Amino acid sequence: MDYLYKFQKLIITLSVFLHASNLGFGQDIVYPDNTNSINNSKKLAFASRTKEPPTIDGILSEDVWDIATPISDFVQDFPNNLTASTEKTEVRLLFDDYALYVGVDLFDSSPSEISERLARRDDWMAGFEGISDWFTIDFDSRYDHQTGFVFAVNASGVQMDATVFDDTDYDEEWNAVWHSEISKDMTGWHIEIEIPFSIMRYTESDSMVWGMDMARYIHRKNEHITWIARPRGVRGIASRYGKLMGFDHVPAAKQIEILPYVLSGRNSIKGEMLSYPDSLGSEFSPLDRIDRNLDGGVDIKYGIGSNSTIDLTVNPDFGWIEADPAIINLTYYETYFSEKRPFFLENSTIFDTPIEMFYSRRIGKMDSRILTAGKLSGKSQDGLSYSVLGALTSDYQSGSWASDLKNEGLSYYLASRLVQDILMGNSFVGLMFNSTGRDGHSTNDVAADQLLSIGNNRLIIDQQIALTDITGLHGLGYAGEIAYDNETFFSTYFSVDYFDDNFDNNDLGYNPRNDLTNFEVGLTFRKQEPGPICRYAFTSIDYNHQSNLDGLVIGNYVSTDFGLTFNNYWRISAGINRSFRHYDDKLTFDIETHNLGPYVKLPQTDGAYFSVQSDQTKQVQIGATIGKGKSIIGDWGEQYSIYINLRPTSAIETSMYYSRNRSFEKFHWLEITEEIINESFSDSIKLHYMFAESQNQMNILTWRVSAGLATNKSIEFYSEYFISRNHFNDQQYLELLEAKAYPVHTEYQPYSSLPDDSSLLEPYLYNEFYAKYSSLNLNLVFRWEFSPGSTFYLIYTTMKTINGKESVTISDFWNYQGGDDWSEFSTEGSLYIKLNYRFNRR
């Protein structure tokens, strides 16, 4: 009944919002005509109806293409902005009741130098960005100047699709099934594309008007040309599109896709863990388990008319997703991990707000199962966007979906959002309502936000206010920013954040901390016109001030940065920064007890960095960064990193990144200890806040290899070797005796290498401090899209960790099988095959 009550509240909220006529909602918005070319004239193109669809083979030889009017008025966007393109491009558009057909002739004076790139479908960075010849076409089918659908094909025939959101960015996680083929001859290369109307969203009418833009990239010249001319610095994406007309009597398209999957494989784990971390370090519990798994589920996508979509998933599997990077976090602040699961990424940009009220990684945590999830999303003719996402999870993951559904450890999640376009579509207001529940614990969050885009997108006012309710405890949060960009030589911004003591959206959202007031201001100057030495240059200065609600300064930071892009496309950047003396009210957080100690004083620290990056369009790319910092009390840190990317063939890419971080801390936080004091036959406990001098080191080595076997087959390999070391000075333990001060040396000594009832294990031996930690992650995925939308996966993953033992080489690490005191290790591995098959009805 509680679930039903939550949904009833949501429906009431939706109804009130939709019928708020005094705000102008529920009325058709009249979107303005676009003026996108150099002289503010309207760019206009026409699609022609055809009785016979063209054969999609990449060869535009059929007479049906003669019906269409060719579009060829492209101009350079880069490197020579607003000048004529160096190669000719012609585009033709046809349509029938089922699909839109695009024919493209990409003429080239040197066809043998056209750059091809085989890569996994939808991987923009591996198959498109700066490394191959490609063509894109964008459609604002809703004609709201805020959203769009993007379709891209490169010179190897690899596809990529995305959506435009908020007129500011792209969502590359949107995936659709459409057909394209390419061909090459002595005149250049050619594309034919078939885009079903069912995968786009529009309002049916006798004569539709869409927004449209097109782009081409010629790799050997590093030349980017577009249909819509954009002077450098002009902001906006969909709001800059030209008009596409000519559609007549296109029926509303409905989409039904059913994607069941079956998965089979095994997991194994071996190793040994310390039975008692505070023991003599020689008592272990063995790890030795093999699990075999056969599972299945289904995804369903249903298009309601041409404006709304329902996505449902039952028992989804994301085992082929790349593992999160290794990290050790013993602080108060939760580690933030990016979302990689397609169900939660696709059409999720509507939930992007100044305060992260929806953090989808909350759903389906480790050792839990997502039993089912669904979302409804769309946009109405009157400019109202909406999305509702719900999920039901089990806190335990057994071998059976049905048994997990019946257990008592169930949790539900509900996120909902409404966004109404205002001011002729350049701005919007929004509402958000979230709810979670588990084990008698419930939360409810509500938020309202607004984005105003004024003066041709030069002035942006973006703000949000949020209220949280956790079992009756109410919290308030606010985030706002004013930004101005004059599109030529400077931009500036001012932002403010406020979160009271009770604000807590972390059941479904993400907020690092409450009890905070944050101010930030910045100014950037830039040079965008190419000169004799560089193509682009910028310099910026930023200032940030943070305090808690008691007025204690917890952050006071200023930085300045500088960057240059040379005419050969090499880049350099540098910066200096200063963190003024302030306090940390969360440093003395005990990871085991979750208790907080007094505030700690932090010294003034100065830092600097320098980085260099080679031309990213070349087969060999390199980059390096060096950074150093030092405090007035002798703390120091340094970081060196190098990046190498190689593309030895048109189908293989490999990259390696190495980072070495070293630092020295005068006082490295350890823990809160307890001392029992006998006072007149009555024991009392005194708390001690312990620190140590520490030499720290962290090394990270990652290696990636991707190989495109065909446009529908790929192999991807990823590995990460992670090492973290803390060398504590056991003669230099310190204690924080008073708040807002530095820790000092005292006679109190709670540690011993032979602990007993009156002492604790030395921190460098205690494995809960991860003073000697190493891990290796390996991930290998083979993908084969054997039919449009249907995919076969072969997935191998392994992870080994060692805690408490230093390894000199990777070989020593990999061959280690335990046996040392105060040291533990585990090796986990899995091998799976997964098959999904797409059933589709027009």
What does each of the following model-derived ranges do?
Residues 9-22:
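Bacterial N-terminal signal peptides
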Residues 369-371, 377, 456, 460-842:
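Exposed, low-structure sequence patches enriched in small/polar residues
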Residues 287-291, 309, 318-544, 549-560, ...:
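Catalytic-domain carbohydrate-binding cleft regions of carbohydrate-active enzymes
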Residues 112-119, 161-163, 202-204, 321-323, ...:
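A short, polar/proline- and glycine-enriched secondary-structure boundary/capping micro-motif
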Residues 27-420, 430:
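Structural preference for beta-rich elements and adjacent junctions enriched in aromatics
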